[in-house]
Amino acid sequence: SGLIISLGEWVLRSACHDLHKINQHSAQPLRMAVNVSVMQFRQPNFLDVLDRALSESAIDPRLLELEITESVAMLDASFMIDLLNRIKGLGVSLAVDDFGTGFSSLSYLERLNVDRLKIDLSFVRQMEQSDGSKRIVETIIQLGRSLQLELIAEGIELESQAQILTAMGCHEGQGYLFAQPLELPILLEHLHSH
């Protein structure tokens, strides 16, 4: 509905504005990822909305990453490939979120020209109990590395999970092991004091 589109635009603008504030308080540039829905991508003015959010916030576009789901690949392929290439032309990076849970297609993965794969937390959480989950995580990491994609594992809660992922060659991780979600004022205070 129209409300979802308006909300998505507000989230994107707010995220860019907050990223500007965060980087004013950070000793090194920090990147932010924003989930974008299939409905947003379908909007004919999406690129204009993104470009406006970047200019209004005055952020370096290389610090913004848009997270897309595998379902984006199910849209008109030529339209999506063109749109994603134009987004990358602005300097914004792209990540496939929750990789391995949707319509994983190697041909789409190559054609969509993404920068990063985010390994779904359901596999990460189960990899110490399930050989199948562990093999899936390892396979995604090997695939990503062979395609020269950055990899990030979602939902890391235990040091043992982080160690396994590091040994497998995963580049980055996110989850409660590292930090819980923080409200912007608390994050800014944390950045200022460190």
Regions found by a protein language model. Give the residues of each.
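Catalytic core of bacterial c-di-GMP phosphodiesterases, primarily the EAL and HD-GYP domains
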Residues: L3-F79, G155
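Short, conserved SAM-binding segment of the class I
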Residues: S14, L83-R86, T139, L143
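EAL-family c-di-GMP phosphodiesterase catalytic domain
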Residues: S37-P44, L63-S78, L90-H194
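Catalytic-core regions built around general acid/base machinery
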Residues: L50-A53, D82-L90
